[in-house]
């Protein structure tokens, strides 16, 4: 298996995997612990086989979550949605158990039709119109609705 | 006007066909360009005419000054006006979307002036319309033509605003959280050398995003506890209306409203050059006895809406 271990190897148990490996699909790692179920909910379709690891030990984050989806690679829209709720997560594409691509979730400049504006009086919540939010700060992730011009932390947004 | 001589030379500015949605869309040069043209409009030195042009006023919310002054400005330029001032009498009542209303009106008129209760409605309209959209107020968000006239008023009173020869002290008082005029004016003032004093009841303070923008732009910003303290040290006192519905407890509103009311007695000993502005309508926050003092400038400010809106209409329709 060429997948990277989720935990730093230790001398007593160098390659312990805390969430079952997958043959083909996508692994989302380094998810902030409290966002793990949200990420799984966001990514999983009805018939997907999903493995979830919560509160796993992480050298970088202390505790983290991992979500593995078998048989599917993420499209651009799903990656944008992931960027909004878990901007520090890493994504590995798995084919025949091998990591063929690994990257940090790309942060778009603009979130388009990804989340509902948190301002209840924003026109996009009342007209049939696409929501558009510009990223104005990466950490903590903060966006500005280009319609109502209000700034929001990403944590206040509801995904569409 | 004196302030023109002190304004920095502005680069060529392209306005034809442009929407006026948010003051954030305008550079310092743009702002000065509009003020310069408004000055020429006021002194009848501009040849701009809009004969044969039609302005549609879509007022989904009530308005007195904005609608009347846009209409007056259009008539003065030789143009004509169509529109409504009550959304209840339009197809909106039947469920027509804003987008569809705009797609129709853009075929009737050469420019659209719009007020709408939803934040961001003007931006949405501008993405659809092929004719310029001028935002006459979108919910609690923006009211750029008011900001242009506020800036014009301040620059007429204090040419130093544009020349930068002296740092002006401008105080905002009242509801700074929900008041769109103070948000827009603060955004515009970020282009100039200004010290800002803020006086607001607890819970109605200026939102952080505007404070951060002001500080980032290099403005000195201070929160001051009482109105009386800013009277003694300001060039401009910009009052806004406190709205009772913002206060969960009516008793608290009753108490607060007296603390944010300026009276003639409070102006005894104020610097002679202090001028009080207000976007109007005022309710209780400026006592009627202030009107007779030399500090009252809010009606003159409202009058400045005509040349400023003449300038905006002429610019976006390419008449100058």
Feature map (PLM): residue ranges:
Chain A
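Cys/His-clustered metal-coordination modules, chiefly Zn-binding fingers
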Residues: 97-160
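Interaction interfaces in information-processing and related assembly proteins
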Residues: 2-103
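N-terminal charge/polar-biased segments
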Residues: 1-12, 150-160
């Amino acid at each position: 298996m060429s997948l990277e271990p989720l935990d730093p190897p230790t001398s007593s148990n160098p390659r312990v995997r805390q969430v079952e490996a997958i043959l083909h699909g996508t692994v989302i790692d380094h998810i902030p612990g409290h966002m793990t179920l949200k990420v799984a909910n966001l990514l999983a379709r009805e018939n997907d086989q999903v493995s979830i690891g919560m509160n796993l030990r992480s050298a970088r984050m202390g505790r983290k979550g991992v979500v593995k989806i078998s048989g599917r690679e993420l499209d651009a829209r799903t990656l944008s949605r992931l960027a909004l709720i878990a901007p520090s997560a890493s994504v590995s594409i798995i084919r025949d158990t091998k990591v063929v691509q690994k990257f940090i979730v790309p942060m778009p400049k603009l979130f388009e039709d990804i989340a509902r504006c948190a301002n209840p009086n924003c026109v996009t919540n009342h007209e049939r119109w696409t929501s558009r939010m510009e990223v104005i700060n990466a950490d903590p992730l903060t966006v500005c609705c280009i319609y109502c011009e209000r700034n929001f932390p990403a944590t206040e947004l509801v995904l569409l | 006007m004196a302030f023109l001589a002190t304004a920095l030379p502005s680069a060529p500015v392209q306005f034809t066909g442009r929407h006026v949605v948010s003051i954030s869309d305008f550079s310092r040069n743009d702002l000065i360009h509009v003020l310069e043209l408004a000055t020429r409009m006021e002194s009848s030195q501009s040849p701009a005419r809009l004969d044969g042009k039609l302005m549609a006023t879509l007022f989904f919310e009530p308005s007195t000054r904005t609608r009347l002054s846009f209409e007056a400005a259009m008539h003065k330029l030789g143009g004509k006006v169509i529109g409504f001032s009550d959304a209840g009498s339009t197809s909106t009542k039947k469920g027509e979307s804003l987008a569809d209303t705009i797609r129709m009106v853009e075929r009737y008129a050469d420019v659209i002036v719009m007020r709408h209760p939803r934040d961001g409605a003007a931006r949405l309209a501008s993405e659809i319309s092929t004719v310029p959209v001028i935002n006459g107020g979108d919910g609690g968000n923006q009211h750029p033509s008011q900001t242009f006239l506020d800036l014009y008023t301040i620059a007429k009173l204090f040419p130093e605003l544009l020349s930068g020869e002296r740092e002006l002290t401008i105080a905002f008082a009242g509801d700074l959280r929900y008041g769109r005029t103070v948000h827009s004016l603060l955004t515009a003032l970020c282009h100039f050398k200004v010290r800002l004093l803020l006086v607001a009841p607890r819970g109605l303070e200026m939102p952080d995003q505007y404070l951060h923008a002001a500080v980032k732009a290099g403005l000195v910003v201070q929160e001051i506890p009482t109105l009386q303290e800013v009277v003694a040290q300001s060039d401009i006192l910009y009052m806004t209306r406190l709205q009772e519905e913002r206060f969960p407890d009516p008793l608290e509103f009753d108490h607060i409203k007296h603390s944010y009311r300026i009276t003639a007695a409070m102006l005894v000993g104020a610097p002679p050059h202090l001028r009080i502005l207000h976007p109007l309508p005022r309710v209780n926050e400026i006592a009627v006895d202030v009107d007779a003092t030399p500090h009252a400038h809010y009606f003159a400010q409202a009058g400045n809406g005509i040349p400023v809106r003449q300038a905006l209409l002429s610019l976006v329709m390419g008449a100058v």
